């Protein structure tokens, strides 16, 4: 499909730079294809679902994945650079998006932290620095880094020297601060590894989760470590030419059994966020049976995709021409979503990671 079919005009003022406070005070646009749009609030979610339905949450935890450092090369001068970690390949290796990538080459050494350590680092770190070697340089500014530390020692160093990776549409307008450390993390986050938040989950407060439990709605956790590729624009003119970056997901046997039981009793599986949806779809057979899953997924969902696992979706409002707007258009229909987004813009809904939410129901085949 042509990528320009997924384009729309979005006023700069619609981009949220801070979340609603409290979390569950966000607005919720309910989208049922063929029906009138409904303006509700996130707090209404328990009343919009049925007892026995299951909300599926992505419990990944955002790590401080933005590292600043100095490139060192034999016979050359130091060059400041930045690496945004996005996919762990081994205990000592991460793929990252680098700036300026054109100044880096295989064999270069980078010292992160130390003198001139990161602006906005997550905490004071006792390390003098963290060293890595550039092993590969790929397309789109991607590099492969081999660190001198590995495993938990590397995790600790990144936690101390790294900075929170706010999306560019926020970070380009204001500095990261202490509020973001809490705001850009779900209240149920528990598995470190994401470099971007599963933002639909940011709306859920402890009080709202209690309300979900009281309504008899099941809560199920899966893990997909969101990568920085989620921020990358689609540069191709046609969706067929776009390559998704892989992300690591885990859905264990017990969770698969719980999800299959939801469907068996006639209830619905409701994904909280596109990341949960992508993992569920990756783990589900064509007949709708959910299987255990552990590994990488690069599933790219566009209109024409036949959904296997998910009956409804809670998600934020996404960027024009993005893979996420393509996904929601596949779920509820492109015309439906273009109309819903036009309504949201006209009605003052707030967009992107810190913005408002929508509850989407699927477009049914005629």
Swiss-Prot record:
Reaction(s) catalysed by this chain's protein: 7-aminomethyl-7-carbaguanosine(34) in tRNA + S-adenosyl-L-methionine = epoxyqueuosine(34) in tRNA + adenine + L-methionine + 2 H(+)
Segments passing through the bilayer: none
Signal sequence annotation: none
Keyword hit for Cytoplasm: yes
UniProt cross-references to SUPFAM superfamilies, sorted A to Z: QueA-like
Pfam families in the cross-refs: Queuosine_synth
GO MF terms held by the record: S-adenosylmethionine:tRNA ribosyltransferase-isomerase activity
Keywords on record: Cytoplasm, Queuosine biosynthesis, S-adenosyl-L-methionine, Transferase
EC number: 2.4.99.17
Locations listed in the record: Cytoplasm
Subunit annotation: Monomer.
Cited function: Transfers and isomerizes the ribose moiety from AdoMet to the 7-aminomethyl group of 7-deazaguanine (preQ1-tRNA) to give epoxyqueuosine (oQ-tRNA).
PANTHER family per UniProt: S-ADENOSYLMETHIONINE:TRNA RIBOSYLTRANSFERASE-ISOMERASE
Protein's recorded name: S-adenosylmethionine:tRNA ribosyltransferase-isomerase
Species for this entry: Methylorubrum populi (strain ATCC BAA-705 / NCIMB 13946 / BJ001) (Methylobacterium populi)
């Amino acid at each position: 499909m042509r990528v320009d079919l997924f384009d729309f005009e979005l006023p700069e003022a619609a981009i949220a730079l801070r979340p609603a406070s409290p979390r569950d005070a966000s607005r919720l646009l309910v989208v049922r294809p063929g029906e009138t749009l409904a303006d509700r609030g996130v707090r209404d979610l328990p009343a919009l679902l049925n007892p026995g339905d299951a909300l599926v949450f992505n419990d990944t935890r955002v790590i401080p994945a933005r590292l600043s450092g100095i490139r060192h090369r034999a016979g050359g001068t130091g060059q400041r650079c930045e690496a945004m970690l996005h996919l762990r390949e081994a205990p000592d290796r991460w793929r990252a998006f680098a700036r300026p990538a054109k100044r880096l080459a295989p064999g270069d050494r980078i010292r992160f932290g130390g003198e001139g350590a990161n602006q906005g680092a997550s905490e004071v770190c006792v390390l003098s620095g963290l060293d890595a070697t550039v092993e590969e340089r790929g397309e789109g500014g991607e590099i492969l880094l081999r660190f001198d530390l590995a495993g938990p020692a590397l995790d600790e160093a990144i936690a101390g020297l790294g900075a929170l990776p706010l999306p560019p549409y926020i970070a380009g307008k204001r500095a990261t601060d202490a509020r973001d450390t809490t705001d850009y993390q779900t209240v149920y986050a528990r598995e470190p590894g994401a470099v971007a938040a599963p933002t639909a989950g940011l709306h859920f407060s402890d009080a709202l989760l209690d309300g979900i439990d009281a309504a008899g709605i099941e809560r199920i956790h899966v893990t997909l470590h969101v990568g920085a590729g989620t921020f990358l624009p689609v540069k191709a003119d046609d969706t067929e030419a776009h390559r998704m970056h892989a992300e690591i997901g885990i859905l264990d046997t017990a969770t698969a059994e719980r999800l299959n039981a939801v469907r068996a009793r006639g209830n619905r599986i409701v994904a909280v966020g596109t990341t949960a949806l992508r993992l569920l779809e990756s783990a589900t057979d064509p007949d709708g049976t959910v299987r255990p899953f552990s590994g990488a997924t690069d599933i790219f969902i566009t209109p024409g995709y036949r959904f296997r696992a998910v009956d409804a979706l809670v998600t934020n409002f996404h960027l024009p021409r993005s893979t996420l707007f393509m996904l929601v258009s596949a779920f509820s229909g492109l015309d439906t979503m273009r109309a819903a987004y036009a309504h949201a813009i006209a009605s003052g809904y707030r967009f992107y990671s810190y913005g408002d939410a929508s509850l989407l129901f699927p477009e049914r085949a005629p």
